[in-house]
């Protein structure tokens, strides 16, 4: 990666595509577009399952490609980021999913041909990676309502109606939500423990966007080396509607029913124990230790992107010493 300033500077690039993602069928057009733009693609790997994705990523990394372009939704890209974290391999992103929030954070165009052009001519930056009991996430980890939303989001619903699927799934999940209690502990001592009751949701953000374009907080960033933690207290429907109206710009964190803090590490304990949603995938359970791996992933972004900087040739080791 030493001299890679753009994707076309790579010695060898592998493309890994989640064929089941919402726009996965368009991957051949994307590969052709990247090749014409000068990306030195030497292998293309459509995958059809999580196990297939894991094995394919292991193989392409072992083959020594210095650029791995991953096409899929946020769950696919987040998993791939966990595999390349702490290495000198550069990650390229093709937004082929429904929400594509990581791409939105990095200012990667949603239009596929524009995304291919931006990737070929893009610059390399470093971004942070969140960890939940060691499992990676790029955007947001959460418990509560968001898990029920994920469970209500069928692949068919996402494929046929796109981002609108999140609104439909949210209404369905809200109708059957049960509140819970949580304790937030801060191992670095930057906050006193927080005991919270009657909660709708707790979320821990590493990136800036989630849920199809919502904003974690007005100041959240993918390279600020900080986690944004918020908890929403259950209440009347009208209160939740007022919060929902503030999600797009992140100003909801100032609402009376929202608790918000920032930290580099937090432990979440809930009663009852709850599953944890990591970038759209249920991949952990409480109690959960959330940490941040600074500058963990080298990734290609458009030349005009201001989302992150390149801080150095190496990422922070994982696990931290």
Label the model's feature ranges:
Residues 142, 146, 203-218, 282:
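Glycine-rich phosphate/pyrophosphate-binding beta-alpha loops
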Residues 1-68, 78, 306-321:
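ATP/NTP phosphate-donor binding region
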């Amino acid at each position: 990666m030493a001299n890679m300033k753009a994707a076309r500077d790579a010695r060898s690039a592998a493309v890994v595509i989640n064929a089941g993602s919402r726009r996965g069928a368009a991957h051949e057009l994307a590969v052709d577009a990247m090749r014409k733009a000068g990306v030195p693609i030497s292998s293309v790997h459509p995958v059809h399952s999580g196990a297939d994705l894991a094995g394919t990523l292991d193989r392409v990394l072992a083959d020594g490609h210095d650029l791995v372009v991953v096409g899929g939704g946020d769950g696919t890209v987040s998993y791939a980021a966990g595999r390349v974290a702490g290495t000198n391999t550069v990650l390229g992103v093709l937004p082929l999913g429904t929400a594509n929030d990581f791409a939105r954070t990095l200012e990667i165009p949603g239009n596929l041909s524009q995304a291919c052009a931006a990737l070929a001519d893009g610059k390399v930056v470093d971004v942070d990676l969140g960890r939940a009991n060691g499992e990676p996430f790029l955007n947001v980890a959460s418990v509560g309502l968001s898990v029920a939303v994920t469970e209500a989001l069928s692949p068919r619903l996402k494929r046929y109606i796109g981002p609108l699927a999140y609104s439909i799934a949210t209404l369905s999940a809200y109708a059957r939500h049960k509140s819970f209690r949580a304790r937030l502990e801060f191992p670095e001592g930057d906050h006193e423990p927080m005991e919270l009751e009657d909660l709708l949701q707790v979320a821990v953000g590493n990136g800036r966007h989630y849920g199809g374009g919502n904003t974690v907080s007005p100041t959240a960033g993918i390279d600020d080396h900080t986690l944004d933690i918020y908890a929403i207290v259950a209440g009347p429907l009208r209160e939740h509607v007022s919060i929902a109206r503030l999600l797009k710009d992140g100003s909801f964190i100032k609402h009376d029913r929202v608790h918000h803090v920032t930290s580099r590490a937090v432990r979440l304990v809930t009663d009852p124990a709850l599953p944890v949603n990591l970038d759209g995938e249920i991949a952990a359970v409480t109690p959960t230790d959330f940490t941040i791996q600074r500058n963990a992933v080298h990734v290609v972004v458009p030349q005009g992107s201001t989302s992150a900087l390149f801080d150095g040739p190496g990422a922070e080791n994982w696990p931290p010493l």
